[in-house]
């Protein structure tokens, strides 16, 4: 699903109703399904369990990138249309130094 597909679904179903069960988290730099330079590894099941338990989609999902099996970067995955924005201090390889915000 891409952002334009999501917008079409939200418009057809009604934004408030659809947002209870649909969310899009983009993974910048990830290949088609995995790999690439992006932070492509995250616990999808835990994110869904959190959503069900809390009754709302996660505000962010922390994903990791590994090189030779070692985590070398973490980054928040943000619910569309938000994106991860660098706070301006700290390592750009650590998710804690980013915030999800509208572009």
Per-segment meaning from a language model:
Residues 1-3:
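Short, small-residue-biased leader/transition segments that mark boundaries at the very start
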Residues 5-12, 51:
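Generic, well-ordered alpha-helical scaffold segments in large soluble proteins
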Residues 14-103:
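Alpha/beta-hydrolase-fold serine-hydrolase catalytic core, especially in secreted/extracellular enzymes
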């Amino acid at each position: 699903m891409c952002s334009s597909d999501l917008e079409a679904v939200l418009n057809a179903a009604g934004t408030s109703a659809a947002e209870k069960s649909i969310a899009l988290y983009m993974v910048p730099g990830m290949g088609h399904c995995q790999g690439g330079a992006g932070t492509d590894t995250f616990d999808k099941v835990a994110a869904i369990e959190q959503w069900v338990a809390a009754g709302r989609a996660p505000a962010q999902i922390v994903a990791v990138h590994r090189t030779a099996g070692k985590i070398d970067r973490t980054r928040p995955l943000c619910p569309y249309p938000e994106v991860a924005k660098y706070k301006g201090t700290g390592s750009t390889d650590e998710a804690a130094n980013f915030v999800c915000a509208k572009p």
